[in-house]
Regions:
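Post-signal-peptide N-terminal segment of Sec-exported extracytoplasmic proteins
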Residues: 39-72
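Proline-enriched interdomain boundary motifs that mark the N-terminal boundary
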Residues: 128-138
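Bacterial Sec-dependent N-terminal signal peptides
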Residues: 12-39
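Beta-strand-rich modules
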Residues: 111, 188-218
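Surface-exposed, short loops/turns at beta-strand junctions within beta-sandwich domains
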Residues: 93-102, 186-196
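Edge beta-strands of extracellular beta-sandwich domains
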Residues: 115-124, 209-223
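Conserved aromatic anchor
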Residues: 51, 143-155
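Aromatic sugar-binding surface patches on proteins
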Residues: 78-95, 180-183
């Protein structure tokens, strides 16, 4: 009888220990590719492919991409969101007058525990042109800076960033407007001091209104001295 009691006690202890084990983290990532367009020095639209890979529940060690035309590249990790966000910010020399290859992009993601997973994302040939910024100026009372632009054809939404040098001062969430004009309170910029500010306006074209995956993004910019 004592032996049976001992075996039962051991079984209960083992059951308790098994319940204390950590749940296995399921590595998963979100991938997206979209066409980014800007105006070059001659004012002509040029294009590049921009990629984003994000993990919400597991660190990423590396990301490699194969484009539909067979070209390969490695993505850099976000220096702030270390291990959870990888992306590329095209350099001026990466932009071409021709659109990026349309088709299926294949992403090989290596997680911190060395598990490797493959994801795909498709890119069509749809793009939008950079906005034509009409004006960037202070209001008459000096309280705000207003940026106005011509509506971007096919854009579902817009996004505005304000930079001073390489430092981002303001970044809005995507927004829609009836009249393409937005004001930024000067008090929002005062903490960064006097100097030249770059207003960077992006048009956004989504693959669908349910997922908000980007198909295309266009960016135009203009400077103002405050």
């Amino acid at each position: 009888m004592k032996k049976l009691h001992l075996l039962a006690l051991v079984a209960l202890i083992m059951l308790g220990l098994s319940g204390c084990e950590k749940a296995t983290v399921q590595n998963e990532a979100f991938v997206d590719v979209f066409i980014k367009s800007i105006a070059n020095a001659q004012g002509m639209p040029v294009y590049a492919a921009q990629h984003t890979v994000i993990s919400y529940n597991g660190g990423i060690k590396s990301v490699s991409i194969v484009s539909p035309d067979g070209a390969t590249m490695q993505l850099d990790g976000d220096p702030i969101d270390t291990g959870y966000s990888f992306y590329n910010e095209p350099a001026e020399t990466d932009y071409l007058t021709t659109l990026p290859a349309a088709g299926i992009y294949t992403y090989t993601v290596t997680f911190d525990d060395n598990e490797v997973k493959t994801y795909t994302n498709s890119l069509s040939a749809l793009s939008i042109l950079p906005a034509n910024i009409l004006s960037l100026q202070k209001s008459a009372d000096g309280d705000s800076v207003y940026i106005s632009w011509a509506s971007v054809i096919n854009a579902h939404a817009y996004q505005l960033k304000v930079l001073k040098g390489a430092t981002q001062v303001i970044a809005t969430n995507p927004f829609t407007v009836v009249t393409p004009k937005v004001g930024i309170p000067v008090t929002s910029l005062n903490s960064s001091g006097a100097g030249v500010y770059t207003f960077q306006l992006s048009g956004l074209y989504f693959e669908s209104t349910t997922t908000y995956d980007l198909q295309a993004k266009s960016t135009a910019k203009m400077d103002i001295t405050l």
